[in-house]
Design a protein with these regions (language model features):
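Alpha/beta-hydrolase superfamily serine-hydrolase fold, recognizing
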Residues: 33-182
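A glycine/proline-hinged amphipathic helix-loop "lid/cap" segment
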Residues: 1-49
Length: 182
């Protein structure tokens, strides 16, 4: 819709900062562990019972927008429905930071998460830009032979062509409920 397109454009032109949607106090009724990696927030959310599965969550937002209440709801549902731990990394965003800084922080956080939660089975989850970032993380893990490697990866509408120049992008937009050409 037109209003949605205007909101998306506003987020890219003047991205909101410190919206607080994924602070520890927002997760009512959950167990949380919050810390930071070089000034960037990381929070692990779990329930009373966990099954050993641990999702490392990379949010979408075009690499400029912070996580939203929708991301928080996804995290809460993964914890409630599947007994998973979910760790969210509030990674550096553009235009203030470069992709190099984002990769550096995400990889430091990944190492800390896997050390703090030794023995968990790790999964990587990314939506939209977070899906593209998840693929970059997998490449770094592979190239640098970092373990543990995620057991599974879930990419929800991953943004993998930042130029938006793929001639078949229109076909993909028809099948992808999150992808819009606006």
């Amino acid at each position: 819709t037109m209003k949605m397109s205007e909101n998306i454009k506003k987020n890219f032109d003047n991205p909101e900062r410190n919206n607080g949607e994924l602070r520890e106090d927002k997760f009512k009724g959950f167990i949380t562990d919050e810390w930071n990696v070089d000034g960037f927030n990381v929070i692990t959310v779990s329930g009373k019972k966990t099954n050993g599965g641990h999702v490392i969550f990379l949010h979408g937002g075009g690499y400029v927008a912070e996580a939203t209440a929708s991301h928080r709801r996804i995290i809460e549902e993964l914890v409630k429905m599947y007994g998973l731990k979910v760790t969210f990394i509030d990674y550096p965003l553009a235009p203030e930071h470069t992709y190099e800084k984002t990769h550096e922080i995400v990889m430091k956080a990944y190492r800390e998460i896997t050390i703090k939660n030794y023995g968990d089975e790790f999964y990587l989850f990314g939506d939209s830009a977070g899906g593209g970032l998840a693929l970059a993380v997998l490449q770094i893990l592979r190239d640098e032979k970092i373990i543990p490697f995620p057991k599974k990866t879930v990419l929800m509408s991953p943004w993998v062509d930042l130029t938006m120049s793929n001639p078949k992008i229109g076909e993909a937009a028809e099948r992808d409920p999150l992808l819009t050409m606006d």
